Amino acid sequence: QVILGRGWDQNDWENKEFPTKNALDRLFPDIPVALRRIDGHALLVNQKALDLAGIDGDTQVPGGTVVTKNGQPTGVLIDTPMELVEAILPKPTLEEKKQALVAAQEIGFKYGLTTVDDAGLNKEDILLIDSLQQTGVLDMRVYAMISNTPDNLDYFLPKGPLVTDRLSVRSVKVYADGALGSRGAALIAPYSDAPKHRGKFITDKDSLKQLAARIAKTKFQMNTHAIGDAANQAVIDVYRDNVRLLRDPRWRVEHAQVLDAPDIEKFSTKIIPSIQPLHATSDMYWAGDRLGEDRLKNAYAYQEQLNYAGIVALGTDFPVEKVNPMLTFYAAISRRDLNGFPEEGFQRENRLSRGSALLGMTRWAAYANFEEKQKGSIEIGKVADFVMLDRDIMEVTHRLIPGARVVATFLNGKIVYSNRD
């Protein structure tokens, strides 16, 4: 028996410090509890979970932090130490996985998704998705990035890309660092609100070099999570050393959130920013505290990235953010939250035009997936994947965009979701 949960964010609380395990220990002394932070880069666990995982005040794991106070764990684990707890948690059954995938598909169709990029899957889950698609249980198209583990790399890389009409497996998901909200993002200079802390690399630069060299010898794409400016700098430098020798790599920097100004100029159609505009409007309330005024200018700089790259791929990053792509579109063009704050838009010089935002969610996203010849626009010869909305999001006022409702979702010309009044 175990209690699992997700969604806490100390930045939304009056006391913005990390929580502790004290209340969980009182309420659940004999049942392990693991509550994942909203960004997925921290866990709050109770003492029972710590004991089962063998974690104490002396535990150190490269690439992460066991938060302690007076030499004892507080219950918060940041990045890599989370794996120690995850290893002792019960795994979902095959039937539970099937039910979850079907439920996720229905939610996706409801919000007009026809292709989902799943950033980090193991071999077993990829083969399950393929099986469910082949037997007609799953219709959703999936661009599956394999998790960076020896087993996955050894299985998929020698075989080459696996591509069907529903599934594309041709990329590797790597984590360079953690998240800004949990101060796990790797920064060049210390955090403005934690002067002795710079965050940490989950995958250091030497390891990134070795992995990139291996991937570059295959037909796989490298897609690396990079939030902090130190992480982005390392990833872009490693990418540049490799992509110059490749004809059409389309390697992606996932999030590309905080960058040193000269590094923004290094984006191109070979090194693509894969961005999530909702991060800007979710983080804007506290990002300045983490980064300070000067660094903040080069954070969430989507229009500037577009100027150099020529394209940007837009995503929602669910379940970190809401699955609804209309909220992504709204955040990209308005740089406001759902209450219309701030009226002038957060760093409005980096908002995207409606045309760029739409391309980032369609044609450019397809290009970033090597799928621009099959999808991304309504043209003869491409798959008939499209949605009908109840309003024209290219024309209505900004405030009406979040409420846009999907009337119908079409996949391969077939209606897979309908909500017609």
Model-derived features: positions:
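Divalent metal-binding segments
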Residues: Q1-Y155, V174-A231, R244, R250, ...
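Short clusters of small/polar residues that mark proteolytic maturation junctions
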Residues: L77-I78, A185, D317, M388, ...
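Acidic (Asp/Glu)-rich catalytic clusters
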Residues: L132-G136, P158-L167, R244-L246, F267-K270
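Substrate-binding cleft/loops of secretory-pathway carbohydrate-active enzymes
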Residues: N152-L162, S274-I275
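Non-cysteine beta-strand/loop elements that form the S-adenosyl-L-methionine
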Residues: L167-G184, K270-T281
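His/Asp/Glu-enriched, well-ordered alpha-helical/loop segment
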Residues: A213-N223, A230-W251, H255-A256, A261-E265, ...
